[in-house]
Regions:
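Arg/Lys-rich, alpha-helical DNA-contact motif
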Residues: 1-105
């Protein structure tokens, strides 16, 4: 049915491997005795998606910072000036991101 196909599409879209989607389908076919196994499968996938979201949010923060960085550099004509801006003069969100980026290097 359509709802079942949407669930499979959702699992695929979240990066679940085909073998695990196949496992889910087989569990559904086996009926209610596999409810616990299906729940575990979805809980595991939820955890994986939450990790992916966290990683994407961190990447997006870096991209936002670099957009600001190059927009500012374009206005002033160089990156040296932007690099010299003290952290305390940056808006808090940019300051936090800059500090995270610098702590990675």
């Amino acid at each position: 049915d359509y709802e079942f196909l949407k669930i499979i599409h959702c699992l695929k879209a979240t990066g679940m491997q085909i073998k695990d989607i196949r496992k889910f389908i087989l569990l559904v076919i086996q009926g209610d005795k596999t409810i616990d196994a299906r729940l575990k499968l979805f809980q595991n996938q939820k955890n994986e998606v939450e990790k992916q979201i966290q990683q994407l949010e961190e990447a997006l923060d870096t991209i936002k910072f670099k957009c600001w960085y190059y927009e500012t550099a374009k206005v002033v004509g160089n990156t040296e000036f932007v690099d010299s801006i003290p952290d305390e003069e940056l808006p808090e969100d940019l300051r936090v991101i800059r500090q995270k980026i610098r702590s990675l290097g």
